[in-house]
């Protein structure tokens, strides 16, 4: 199961969440990971001794209870209640850290962080962060682009011209997200987010030209850090026989399953004389229309059927 260290969580969110170390530095390598019986959103929560979260957040009410615990009002000791499995404790709302909590975290190698932010906002940000960071992932071969604000993954065998097609689309004002190895993360039940590894970011390999830095050539707007995957365009090599066998009036919706998420897909035959950049743009525009409930093929078939009925009626009404 995917997991991250407390150290990475701190480094990624230190400035955004105003985090600071208070104790337990030796536990910086503690792991925070998805459990089989718990969703990612359940990893973070207010201090809970019955159903402990991996990340325990101390807010106003929890801080007041800990102060009572430390003063002996409750009849319990820290060790009695804190004998639970947890990876990290965060004291929010800019509250002071009680000496008892600091000592317990130090002795048990549990990282203790503080934040000046309110606990509900802190937990919301951490849940979104963990949902993205710990998402199930896969790597697909292809080129991932932002075309008309739609995340489009172009796939196909090597040598079909995916990179050249991507370069043409970028020159027409669209944006590159990832080339060659597209990292896909399931950030929601029906949502895949495509990203590029830091090593390959900004680069596009084109046969004959080598490695191109798209950001330097086309400017900042030619690159996007991530995008929701909505459409897959699969390039296939086609000859005359293949083109003859195509169903030109198909109304079936093709999908491809990635990480148990169905993504709309379109197959584009690659043949001499076909302008693939224009075809990709047309496919994306058609997809946008279908999202709005407009299907050109179905509309044509309905119009054709209406015309046939009108002709049939006209023939019946015509005198012999």
UniProtKB/Swiss-Prot annotation:
Domain of life: Bacteria
Keywords: ATP-binding, Kinase, Magnesium, Metal-binding, Multifunctional enzyme, Nucleotide-binding, Serine/threonine-protein kinase, Transferase
Reaction catalysis annotation: [HPr protein]-L-serine + ATP = [HPr protein]-O-phospho-L-serine + ADP + H(+); [HPr protein]-O-phospho-L-serine + phosphate + H(+) = [HPr protein]-L-serine + diphosphate
Molecular function as annotated in GO: ATP binding; magnesium ion binding; phosphorelay sensor kinase activity; protein serine/threonine kinase activity; protein serine/threonine/tyrosine kinase activity
Alphabetical list of Gene3D superfamilies matching this protein: HprK N-terminal domain-like (3.40.1390.20), P-loop containing nucleotide triphosphate hydrolases (3.40.50.300)
Region called Important for the catalytic mechanism of dephosphorylation, residue ranges: 269-274
Active site, per annotation: 141, 162, 180 (proton acceptor), 248
GO biological process: regulation of carbohydrate metabolic process
Family matches, as NCBIfam families: hpr-ser
Remarks, miscellaneous: Both phosphorylation and phosphorolysis are carried out by the same active site and suggest a common mechanism for both reactions.
HAMAP family reported in the protein's UniProt record: HPr_kinase
Record family assignment: Belongs to the HPrK/P family.
Protein name per UniProt: HPr kinase/phosphorylase
């Amino acid at each position: 199961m995917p997991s991250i260290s407390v150290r990475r969580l701190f480094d990624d969110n230190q400035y955004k969440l105003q985090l600071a170390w208070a104790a337990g530095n030796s536990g910086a390598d503690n792991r925070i990971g998805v459990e089989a019986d718990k969703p990612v959103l359940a990893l973070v929560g207010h201090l809970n001794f019955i159903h402990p979260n991996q990340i325990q957040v101390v807010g106003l009410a929890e801080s007041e209870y800990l102060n009572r615990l430390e003063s002996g009002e409750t009849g319990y000791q820290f060790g009695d209640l804190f004998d639970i499995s947890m990876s990290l404790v965060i004291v929010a709302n800019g509250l002071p850290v009680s000496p008892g909590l600091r000592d317990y975290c130090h002795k048990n190698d549990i990282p203790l962080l503080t934040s000046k932010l309110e606990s509900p906002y802190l937990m919301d940000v951490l849940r979104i962060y963990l949902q993205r960071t710990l998402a199930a992932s896969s790597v697909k071969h292809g080129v991932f682009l932002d075309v008309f604000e739609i995340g489009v993954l172009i796939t196909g065998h090597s040598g079909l011209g995916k990179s050249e097609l991507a370069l043409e689309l970028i020159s027409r004002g669209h944006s590159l997200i990832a080339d060659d190895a597209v990292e896909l993360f399931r950030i929601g039940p029906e949502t895949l987010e495509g990203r590029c590894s830091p090593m390959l970011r900004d680069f596009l390999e084109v046969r004959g030209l080598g490695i191109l830095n798209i950001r330097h050539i086309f400017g900042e707007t030619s690159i996007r850090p991530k995008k929701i995957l909505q459409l897959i365009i699969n390039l296939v090599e086609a000859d005359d026989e293949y083109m003859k066998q195509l169903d030109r009036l198909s109304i079936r919706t093709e999908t491809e399953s990635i990480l148990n998420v169905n993504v709309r897909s379109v197959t584009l035959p690659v043949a001499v004389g076909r302008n693939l950049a224009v075809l990709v743009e047309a496919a994306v525009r058609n997809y946008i229309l279908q999202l709005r409930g407009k299907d050109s093929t179905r509309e044509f078939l309905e119009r054709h059927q209406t015309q046939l009925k009108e002709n049939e009626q006209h023939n019946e009404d015509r005198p012999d």
